[in-house]
Amino acid sequence: MLALMDADGNIAWSGEYDEWGNQLNEENPHHLHQPYRLPGQQYDKESGLYYNRNRYYDPLQGRYITQDPIGLEGGWSLYAYPLNPVNGIDPLGLSPADVALIRRKDQLNHQRAWDILSDTYEDMKRLNLGGTDQFFHCMAFCRVSKLNDAGVSRSAKGLGYEKEIRDYGLNLFGMYGRKVKLSHSEMIEDNKKDLAVNDHGLTCPSTTDCSDRCSDYINPEHKKTIKALQDAGYLK
């Protein structure tokens, strides 16, 4: 699914596509011209094809109509788009991004960030303490910052954005949080708050402990919650 948002955060255009870029439906109340399809592609109305900088792509066939200009360097098939377009992209019409752009270092950064964030999230679910969502957001990203690795921090920030997009989508079906569907403006505000907390944790000074950095997100009157977090090693 793709969407365009205006300066106020309102969805001005949205479209749903299958794995190969075929448009399934479109919501365009303002009659906007929006030609973008899969990453790097622009819809050509006259031909019905997608322009990919170096060649044209046919979404009905799921392949390019001309051979790869870089030959076999782009893969064994001279006409193929990434064999798994869910995980691979080809923004220039040359070779899949997982071959051309993503290096082993980036994959390791992503995995390290994912491990820290997911471990902290699992602790949050296990402890099941009310009113601690933002605290755990802060702690997860603060833990990433302590690696002092810009690449891992960048990956973590991207994962944080992906989670908020996922949460927004879940809310559309009443499956987010307490299963009470929020309005668009309420959900945008919720997303903004979470992202701000993520940044607060991620920018923790090297001389500051994560428990000190994030303790303000815990109500000081909630003594049992504080005790549980201390026992779990999250607070001093």
From Swiss-Prot:
Domain of life: Bacteria
Region forming the signal peptide: none
InterPro entries reported for this sequence: RHS, Rhs_assc_core, T6SS_VgrG/RHS
NCBIfam families xrefs: Rhs_assc_core
Stated family: Belongs to the RHS family.
Annotated protein name in UniProt: Putative uncharacterized protein YlbH
Organism encoding this protein: Escherichia coli (strain K12)
